[in-house]
Regions:
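Canonical radical SAM enzyme core domain
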Residues: 1-9
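Auxiliary Fe-S-binding modules of radical SAM enzymes
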Residues: 15-154
Length: 154
């Protein structure tokens, strides 16, 4: 299957909506959804990872001043998926601070990373991985995108 045209249209749609932030990642099937029975028709997870990273890099070129999240869906396929996204265009990464007792209620896909880590451990590991990727975490800094800041000044 070739999704190139659809994905390009998605990027152009995001630009036309004048958005300030995007969180996107590869589609990950879940057994409790109607699409589960068609999972064999999906591209391989490695291909979905490649496409997801490609979308992040293309969106960064198309919209250089928005915030783009490095999502856990990328990490579900590749343990370094979020770091790879940071290296090619993402500029936002979020720790999982949901209390452990509630995490089971938020299973968007199989193999969601960090389901057994507490908020402190999740944040610590996240900070270490961001540092390894060569990026710098901006703590205690307002996170509005430059796009948003410029838009509200008008």
């Amino acid at each position: 299957m070739d999704f190139t045209g659809d994905l390009a249209d998605d990027l152009l749609f995001l630009k036309s909506m004048d958005i300030d932030m995007v969180g996107m990642g590869p589609y990950l099937e879940h057994r409790d959804t109607p699409l589960w029975r068609y999972r064999e028709a999906l591209p391989s997870q490695q291909e979905r990872l490649r496409l997801g990273l490609h979308m992040v890099s293309c969106l960064r070129l198309l919209m250089p001043d928005i915030n783009i999240a490095a999502t856990t869906a990328l990490q579900a396929i590749d343990p370094e998926g979020r770091e790879k996204a940071l290296e090619i265009g993402a500029n936002v990464i979020m720790p999982n601070i949901t209390p452990l007792g509630n995490r089971g209620n938020y299973r968007l896909y199989e193999n969601k990373p960090g389901m057994d880590e507490g908020a402190e451990e999740s944040t610590r590991r996240l900070m270490e991985s961001v540092k390894r990727s060569g990026c710098e975490i901006q703590l205690d800094t307002w996170g509005d995108s430059l796009h948003f800041q410029n838009r509200v000044k008008k």
